[in-house]
């Protein structure tokens, strides 16, 4: 192995674009990264679409980005798997979906479909919801729909178009839109249980915020400067369509991290201790894919185990490793990076740094980068391999606040400089990449804020003069390259090659 620790820093949402308009990364003052790019060899690697197991042209995301980096190969996940089953009509006979339908029939109860109504393809795809509506209808039931607003992976004010498409589906396959809630409430992942419970209570009909027409309600929220992500949970005033005992519920989100908390309230888990004051009896609760630690009735698409990940190779080589991130991205350097499973590897340590308790991260663009760096420097000499995530470019990028995103990038740059200095003192090497783009495109052609991810490539660079890169590449090449640099054998399961120039 190369002397000194080897560190992989994943800069979440740090994409590359030559276009300076709305580019918080190029326009920020980043003396460390500027010098690194000037003095050290580097390449730009693909982080979206077919390169990370998504449909061609689909924006990358943190889940598949970290999964691909850690696996050293393309792993076909939620969106592609489900799309394929829909295309081949295999979805029509999905065992769990039919069991949920039969449960509702047997109990003379409702079947509910809830999830992010968005074409974004990051946490869900509205087409999957439309297909489930069709299948439920063709099996003789009228589904009840619970809409989660997006506004992050798509434009901040785009849900009306999705609702119009949903209404077109419901004209052919009758059902009811019963509730609406912004993902801020229904998809929290930071243990802000007051948000999750507000969404949950709305689904159960405990709240008293009503609407007559969902599109009218959204327009009213818009008039109050409340957009899709933050839509206040509301429902129609009809006790027959609330979620209650004996019902069947299908959570249509395939990405787990933002689906776990609300699922815990419905079906319990091994990861949360939060008490549910309104538990339901004889509920058939189905989830689209495995949400680690959640204990549903059944899963439509159980996770396929990824073997011989980067972390496993390091552990099996007898080396020590550290994973470190703040709350918002902790699951990405652990669960996703390890192939979509919760695992404690031999000689592995994990450090979770609390995310700041703010509504949105434009309020504190530095996020917890300083605290992460402090903890890292304190522990750097204790480990052979370190994987860390800095969330700034992604989480502040998602707010659509350009000036704050610039501040986020500048804060990030100063922490990378600190890490660079320390790792060089230890005769170690730092590799830097990103999981997808975001903060490099903060404005559209009409100067409207952009909050979503991009399809742009990301940088792959090292602070070691001896490291030279072959080109081109993708996120799948990162793990083989670092293993090659360390002198470790690249497992056959990693079908992507090292980019290390010999």
Swiss-Prot record:
Pathway: Carbohydrate degradation; glycolysis; pyruvate from D-glyceraldehyde 3-phosphate: step 3/5. Pfam families: iPGM_N, Metalloenzyme. GO terms for biological process: glucose catabolic process; glycolytic process. Keywords: Glycolysis, Isomerase, Manganese, Metal-binding. The keyword Oxidoreductase does not apply. Its EC number is 5.4.2.12. InterPro entries: Alkaline_phosphatase_core_sf (IPR017850), BPG-indep_PGM_N (IPR011258), Metalloenzyme (IPR006124), PGAM_B_sf (IPR036646), Pgm_bpd_ind (IPR005995). The keyword Isomerase applies. Mn(2+) 2 binds at residues 12, 62, 435-436. Binds 2 manganese ions per subunit. Catalyzes the interconversion of 2-phosphoglycerate and 3-phosphoglycerate. This is 2,3-bisphosphoglycerate-independent phosphoglycerate mutase. The gene is gpmI.
